[in-house]
């Protein structure tokens, strides 16, 4: 990918520092020239509070949700941020302690209560966090910040004010939903979450939220389950972070990283476990891929199997002459990558960060090709007949289809992650370019563009600079897929630099067009979107 940059100064630690929200927007200092057509807001989510009083959060996905906004107008940029007033945040601020258990941090009963009150408080049921630090997405004319539980939080994208909490369980049968829904051109929202199916077994439901209609009724009120995927283990659902969608098909990748529901319901309530304590790996299952017909709402019984990997982000999925092309950011093996994302590990000195990353699963960008039509007469043969891929699908005697991928990118401890594409033009359709955040031993230190057809790579990188997920914004008169810009929030703690800036790159070659510097640190952000006026 590039000559590997070292980080002995440990500037990446600034990504994990608590900051205060802003009372008014800051005017950014622009160098270069922001395209005049770039008008709107870059909205992003991430943790901004890494401790409450003397109580620290322990995992990358624990800090309290901070909502960020960069406004673009006539070549000028302003920056604003506010904490999302979730129940988790408001109660923590009120009681000056961690009140609701987060991903890797346990909340314990109020020490001021007597022993009987503290004991009985364990039996009120599992209290699920609403800490919406992962992503933002539109539903109708509204915007919601989300994590991966059943709670989403409606926010005002102009003022960043928190409007209300919404419990998806009140509308559809899911225990939670991913932070990576698919949004169709008409505004229809698709998402996936696990649920309890027939005979108290676990399954995965695809939920659909329709677009806003003329009656202006909240589309969430009309949410429905459109198809259900079975679970390989009746009591242990897999961790699901994203899924694939095309105009006609839904693809769900079931990995060996499992949630032990017995541990979740018992140990959590009685002994103070957290989400991370409830994960375990099934070392023998490998990966199961599932497909459903989106329009007919029907599950296919094709048994796609492959070797084990972790999966967080789908890049894109599309149909090609009777096959589904599924491009994924994989991590080899069955061990859970999140085991390596505790803040203590991420804040270590550079040599220790590298040592920890060497123990973790190896990242790789892969393309899997799934044949949709299976003929038993083809047992033992490669069913993939497409000329432009080396991926294979072998029909086995037990009627499983064993998949081997084509590797699109692989580098030692160098990940292409947090992928983005020209989603409006190419989501669920054939495409050429993907943009990603380059992780160097888990440290984000480069931005990348990948040609998925030729495997050519372009890159932006500077010393002591730590970018975020790249967001592609198409220019109004675009003719080609990569006509536009890429936006990324960069933390820059090096000598002689401003604390942070918004970077604007030419999407063609990742050359710098402009940057908008601000006089404040910006902690790590995970995902977001560009909202046009």
Swiss-Prot record:
InterPro entries: Carotenoid_Oase. A lipid is attached at residues 112, 231, 329-330 (S-palmitoyl cysteine). GO terms for biological process: camera-type eye development; circadian rhythm; detection of light stimulus involved in visual perception; neural retina development; response to light stimulus; retina homeostasis; retinal metabolic process; retinoid metabolic process. Palmitoylation by LRAT regulates ligand binding specificity; the palmitoylated form (membrane form) specifically binds all-trans-retinyl-palmitate, while the soluble unpalmitoylated form binds all-trans-retinol (vitamin A). It is found in: Cytoplasm; Cell membrane; Microsome membrane. Retinal pigment epithelium specific. PANTHER family: BETA-CAROTENE DIOXYGENASE, RETINOID ISOMEROHYDROLASE. The modification N-acetylserine is found at residue 2. Binds 1 Fe(2+) ion per subunit. Fe cation binds at residues 180, 241, 313, 527. The modification Phosphothreonine is found at residues 101, 105. Belongs to the carotenoid oxygenase family. Its EC number is 3.1.1.64, 5.3.3.22. It catalyses: an all-trans-retinyl ester + H2O = 11-cis-retinol + a fatty acid + H(+); lutein = (3R,3'S)-zeaxanthin; all-trans-retinyl hexadecanoate + H2O = 11-cis-retinol + hexadecanoate + H(+). Keywords: Acetylation, Cell membrane, Cytoplasm, Endoplasmic reticulum, Hydrolase, Iron, Isomerase, Lipid metabolism, Lipoprotein, Membrane, Metal-binding, Microsome, Palmitate, Phosphoprotein, Sensory transduction, Vision. The keyword Oxidoreductase does not apply. GO terms for molecular function: all-trans-retinyl-ester hydrolase, 11-cis retinol forming activity; all-trans-retinyl-palmitate hydrolase, 11-cis retinol forming activity; beta-carotene 15,15'-dioxygenase activity; cardiolipin binding; isomerase activity; metal ion binding; phosphatidylcholine binding; phosphatidylserine binding. It is a lipid-anchor. The modification N6-acetyllysine is found at residue 113. The keyword Ribosomal protein does not apply. The modification Phosphoserine is found at residue 117. Its main location: cytoplasm. This is Retinoid isomerohydrolase. Its cofactor is Fe(2+). Interacts with MYO7A; this mediates light-dependent intracellular transport of RPE65.
